[in-house]
């Protein structure tokens, strides 16, 4: 590859990354705004974030985590 082609490819990659980083920042700001809105309507943001994490787990992993949590809570009497 010629130096010109390599330079152009590098610039394209960097440009795409910069664009995606900006989109990611914009999305993060939108998510923050949604959580603030939910909070102002009485929703517990911490609980919402926990639910979002749990939704990402498959059913077997979630059941395993729930069982372990229940075991620990029973052991500690909470």
From Swiss-Prot:
Protein name: UPF0335 protein RBE_1185
Lineage: Bacteria, Pseudomonadati, Pseudomonadota, Alphaproteobacteria, Rickettsiales
Tree of life domain: Bacteria
GO molecular function: DNA binding
Family: Belongs to the UPF0335 family.
């Amino acid at each position: 590859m010629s130096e010109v082609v390599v330079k152009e490819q590098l610039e394209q990659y960097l440009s795409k990354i910069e664009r995606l980083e900006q989109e990611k920042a914009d999305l993060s700001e939108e998510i923050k705004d949604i959580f603030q809105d939910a909070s102002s309507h009485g929703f517990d943001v911490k609980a919402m974030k926990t639910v979002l994490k749990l939704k990402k787990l498959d059913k077997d992993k979630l059941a395993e985590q729930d069982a372990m949590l229940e075991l620990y809570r029973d052991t500690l009497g909470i």
